[in-house]
Amino acid sequence: MEKRVRLILGLACGCLAGAAQANDFGITAKLGTLGMGVEGIFGLTDQFNARLGFNRFDFDRTETIDDIKYNLDLKLKTVSLLADWHPFGSAFRFTAGLMNNGNELSGASATDGLTVGDTFYPDVGLNAKLDFDATSPYLGIGWGNALAADKGWGFNMDLGVLYQGSGNVTLIPTGANASLVSPADIAAEEQRFEDDIKNYKYYPVFSFGVSYKF
């Protein structure tokens, strides 16, 4: 994971060097399915920009997975390095890049008894954790070029897909009889959990924001 973070930071430094030569810079505040975020926008050429951003949002929800009710805490956290191509210098753009993906889902069930795998265990609950590939590719389209004007305010929108992998599930038994839960039942329950959330492999990204060019 550290190597991947260093790779993203190294690419970002290259973008910053190119932006310094181009002498174009802007910022964006945005809101979307990755949470609330801020981006620096760096002009590379008349048609290409680079963006370095950070997104974060936390919220709680209750969800039933494989007939087990969990109180879940969803933490969205990504660091993005994106390249925008504006054909003919237009506002429309194609976007590709990488995100350091810290998105994570964690939570717990009640400890009054439940079925783990195919076995019912009284006075048992489960703590759950779900995370994804540390480095995730992104592809999308969008509208808005903050660096097109001499300076001032603008609006932008992104629509795309973040491929974050199948997800890694860890379940830990809790409660008075936690020690009785067999590893085989835990492994079976983890597989069912992963099957239930397999659609999270492709995470839809939509955002809109306000930008300013200096």
Report residues per predicted region.
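Sec/Tat signal peptide C-region and signal peptidase I cleavage site
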Residues: 16-24
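Repeated loop/turn-to-beta-strand initiation elements of outer-membrane beta-barrel proteins
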Residues: 25, 48-50, 91-94, 153
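Solvent-exposed loop/turn segments connecting transmembrane beta-strands
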Residues: 27-42, 149, 200-202
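Residues on the lipid-exposed face of transmembrane beta-strands in outer-membrane beta-barrel proteins
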Residues: 29, 38-42, 81-85, 96, ...
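Transmembrane beta-strands of outer-membrane beta-barrel pores
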Residues: 31-35, 54-60, 87, 98-104, ...
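Outer-membrane beta-barrel channels and translocator barrels
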Residues: 45-47, 88-90, 146-150, 203
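Extracellular/periplasm-exposed beta-strand and loop segments of Gram-negative cell-envelope proteins
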Residues: 54-81, 103-136, 165-205
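Outer-membrane beta-barrel "beta-signal"
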Residues: 84, 88, 152, 201-214
